[in-house]
């Protein structure tokens, strides 16, 4: 059992990684998951979530590479696995798919992302 899933599903200060670009992208991903949960039949909202997530992962990985962050390889692998699963989802989204996305994002930020605080 990991960190609790916020309800309503919104970003709050407890998710802060202290890099403005990354915090802003995390907020956008939270909003994307929230929007998909609100309208699970919308393929457009799912596609936007995928695009925002892919862009964020790219930005975050670039920062890790530039700073020579030692945790980069497993972090990138986690991103690739999640993005693969996200791209495999189809609208209408079922509860299991939405719950997976919600839980993954919370656990990823609070465990894996928090490891790079102060190192990028």
Curated annotation (Swiss-Prot):
Keywords, sorted A to Z = Iron, Metal-binding, Muscle protein, Oxygen transport, Transport
Q: Which cysteines are joined by disulfide bonds?
A: none
Binding positions for Fe cation 1 per the UniProt entry: 26, 56, 60, 113
Task: Name a GO molecular-function annotation.
Answer: oxygen carrier activity
Q: Which domain of life is it from?
A: Eukaryota
- Binding annotation for Fe cation 2: 60, 75, 79, 108, 113
Recorded hits in SUPFAM superfamilies, A to Z, give: Hemerythrin-like
Family recorded in the similarity comment: Belongs to the hemerythrin family.
PANTHER family documented for this protein: BACTERIOHEMERYTHRIN
Task: Sum up the protein's function in the record's words.
Answer: Myohemerythrin is an oxygen-binding protein found in the retractor muscles of certain worms. The oxygen-binding site contains two iron atoms.
Instruction: Return the protein name.
Output: Myohemerythrin
Organism, scientific name: Sipunculus nudus
